[in-house]
Amino acid sequence: MQELYGVKVSPDMVTAITDKIIPEIREWQKRQLEEQYAIVFVDATYFNVKQDGIVVKKAVYIALGVTMTGEKEILGFYIGESESAKYWTSILNEIKNRGVKDILIMCSDGLKGLKEAIGAVYPMTEFQRCIVHMIRNTLQYVSYKDRKELAQDLKQIYQAATEEAGYNNLIELEEKWSKRRVSLDNWINNWENIQPFFKYGPETRKIMYTTNAVSYTHLRAHETEA
């Protein structure tokens, strides 16, 4: 605090502040939620945390819901001890116990065990792999000079009018880019979790594709950490 704002804060003041804030945080964490959400995004960000005198990197998962009227709401923050179906089942049950009866679409990157947990807790919910993460994961293994062209080509997949057209474009692009030693296997292997995207119209796709709200939440969280 002194380095950032020029204000010296004593340990007693920190204790007094946290004693006041922690009950409010716990109340917020337990608050009732909407009965139904159109989309819930689950994404991770990482913080350096001091644990037993050692600085370790911890994952914090953010669940952000989009209501049936299009409003965005943070459902909760969850510290990730381990990714597993059991871990995600406990989180989804916690969300369910806070009043959420139905989620139409759950959108996330390939978090281990999440899809299985969704099937157990919300069996009618559709799981959708995050398109933005798919794009980023593909581009990170490509040379800088090829990234712009590949990013443009990938639009032929996720902007296709139908699932069939998107898949056909994917196969054609795989053939094209394999000659440059660029693999699109990640898209092919995950197609089952990508194809729900094509069931929806442009406006819904735009919401599913965009991660600005989640990214903004990550940014603000890291600003607080700093």
What are these regions, as identified by a protein language model?
Residues 1-3, 203-204, 220:
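Short hinge/gating elements
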Residues 217-226:
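Conserved small/polar residues in nucleotide/adenosyl-binding loops
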Residues 3-11, 16-108, 112, 116, ...:
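RNase H-like nuclease fold core
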Residues 84, 162-166, 224:
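Alpha-helix N-cap recognition
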Residues 119-213:
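Extended amphipathic alpha-helical interaction segments
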Residues 111-112, 136, 225:
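Alpha-helix N-cap/helix-start and coil->helix boundary motif
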